[in-house]
From Swiss-Prot:
Superkingdom of origin organism: Eukaryota
UniProt-recorded name of the protein: Bud site selection protein 22
Keywords linked to the UniProt accession: Coiled coil, Nucleus, Phosphoprotein
Coiled coil start-end: 426-470
Biased composition (Basic and acidic residues): 338-348, 431-459, 466-497
Amino acid sequence: MPSESSVSIYKLDQLEYQYHYLTKSLQKFEPRYPKTAKLYNCIGKKNKKKIEKLLNSLELKTLDKELDESYSKLLNNKIHYYETHLSKCIKEQIQKISKKNSSKVKDAQKNKSPSIDIEKMLATQLSLDDLALFMTRFRLIKILHQRIKQKSKKIEGDTNNKTWLNNNDYSGYINDKTSKWNPSNIWNEVITKLPSCEKLNALIGQSKIVQNLTESFDLSICLIFGFDVSAMKAKKYGAREKTANANQTHSNIDYDTDDGNEKNAIDSKSNAIGAQTQSNKETTSDNEDLLIKEYEGMLGSSGDEGEGGGYLNPNINYNEVTDEEPSEASSDEDDSDERFSDSEENEPRRKKPKLHNLPELMAGYYSGNDTEEESDEDNKNVKGKKKKRDTAEDRTAREQMSNEPKRKNRRGQRARRKIWEKKYGSQAKHVQRELEKEMEDRKQRQIEYEARVAKREAKAASLEASRSREREDRRTETNNKKEKESASTGEEHPSWIAKRLAEEKLQKAKFEGKKIKFD
């Protein structure tokens, strides 16, 4: 069953349709519910006749009065409902803030930092209920004033509609700028004058309960004034989605920048290590040439060693050569090696990425000959060069892979369903499935209900049959008892016998009357 508010709004929609029909301005009118247009543009003959009768019997004066009353009732009901609920909510929020700040006030006094002391705020001028009412009316009157302005812009030529809008409890406060409930007076004389009341008002406005109540009040007034509520809801939902997407993109950008910085640091370190290794190789090759020149006389072929034909150089003092200290070049090499090792130790260790998971060898080990070992060493040198090339290529490939756009995560089921509802409305597949489920549940409930009713009827019939049998049994029992009693008495009383015989004689007696003649 629809609620009272929805029924009254539907009635208002019908009254407005009738008014625009009489004023011949149906093109401007946009009905709140699709039922109103269907009702007044029906196809059946009987319904058409009824509606024609209804429209012909209408009068502008009566319609104006009805519209005025319905607008004022609806607006006043909404105002009263939301004022009571919002004032309670704001009062609770103020009490929560006062409890939280009671412990913070002492710390603030020590640190000399500003804090909200609600007891001092309300000690002189207002009570807590009055402050809550001021804050609620400040919010609700502002919302209603904005929507009245928006509606009056739509209806610039129609004076009757403007009078309908101003018939509510808050219209007097909006028009009368001297009243204490005017939002500008509330701001200037209450919120700004009380100490730290602006901060309190902002904190209350941030609470979700207050925001939800104000939004629902705004939407209900928009529905009364005939605005497109679904479009407003879609706008709010879109704004929330945009903020969520913006936060996601911001976090993704930060993640990408961090990855890029890490990659640049790794590349720079690898280049530095490569340069150091090249310099070390050059120094070692120079030192080897010098040593070969010094020990030319001592070197010989493998064949000479076997024959024992080695010779000594008379010009060289071998004791001096062996007792020499290491040269400057070699010391420089050691220093450079030590520095390189220290620098490597000081740098933070990073996990090397595993490029491939290679399969294990299936064959056994075979040593081979000396010639094969030499060929293997040559091959290793060749492969080492190839490996260097491969690492550079792998590095470029990794960079290209990192530049590829990352795959976006799929949206959740609820988000996708909301999008489908916006696109297809009631014809979305999940909506259709839900409707089918509801219909099946209804059918199942109907079947179960019918089965229960049939059971009850069968039970009642069986009870009635058993009761009728019991009655018949009782009757037969009573009759049998009477017969038994008469049989048990034996012979009848003589008076009864005499009476019975007299009756029998009377029945058998003949008529012996005389005819009497009158002169």
